Each structure stands twice: as structure tokens, then as C-alpha cells.
Amino acid sequence: HVVPFTEIQLEINEKCPHDCITIIMRRFMMRIAEQLAKNNNCTALITGENMGQVASQTMQSLYVTNASVSMPVFRPLIGMDKTEIIEIARKIGTFETSILPYEDCCTVFVAKHPKTKPVLQKIIEYEKKLDEDAMIKKAVETTELIIAGK
């Protein structure tokens, strides 16, 4: 699934504290993923997160991210180091794609000093400035499905 996320990023960037935009974007990504999973009769989410690689992957950040969804979230790479992950990527043929240059939400909307220990209640308060339901609905409705190998 390719989810159009730019409008959500712009609104979060405009209405929320800059040091919290990364975690709020992650929470929106999880909510969108959860809705897409439900639409496809899936009962869990799987991510490629690894503990401590970036600010959004601290224990406290993962807790705040998880709190945005009700589905179980599996993170099979959580305890691996970067070398192990690269080795797996090479084995399954995704490494070359993973190193291609591109701009994503983490590079375009990066906070200079992102929160590494976000407080859930504060994040929820910031999110009240956003029309969460409408934003997620639009993103899900305009998602493009790409079948690998076709």
C-alpha cells in the first residue's frame, strides 16, 4: 500500500509542537495501517522497527506509538543490530531498494531535537488540534495498492 501522507504531515507540522511531530506522525501511520489491516481482514501489524535506532524507537516512544492502535504490533527486528538487519535484507533481496535515495517524512519533516521520551497524555492533547478521523479516512480512501512483481 502506498499511502498519500503529505497533507497529514503538513497539518501536523503546522498545528503540533515541532519536537513532537515525529511521534505524532508515527501514531498516524499506525492508525492508517490498522485501518488498512482491518479492511484486509488482518488481525495484527508488523513493523521493521529496531530498538534505539532513531528517536521514535526508544522504549517510551514505542509505548506511545502502540497506544494509538488496538491491534497487536509485532516487531521481529526489535533486538537485532544494524549488521544483522542488513544481512537479512541482502538475503531476501530488499537491501538495494532500501538504500535508494528518496525523501520521506523523516527527512523532510525532521525535528532538530525530537522527543525521545514522549508523554502519552501530552501527545493526545496535541492530537486534539487535528481532525484525526477525517485525516485517516481520506488517507485510507486514497491509498494505492501495488502488487509486487506486477
Model regions: which residues?
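Short, exposed beta-strand "edge-strand" segments with a Pro/Gly-rich flavor and a Y/T-containing core
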Residues: 1-2, 74-80, 112-118
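Generic beta-strand/beta-sheet core signal
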Residues: 3-6, 47-48, 76, 99-100, ...
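Active-site adenylate/phosphate-handling loop in enzymes that bind or generate adenylated species
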Residues: 9-10, 15-87, 91-92, 138-144
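Peripheral terminal appendages
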Residues: 42, 58, 62-71, 92-150
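A conserved beta-strand->alpha-helix junction
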Residues: 1-15, 102-104
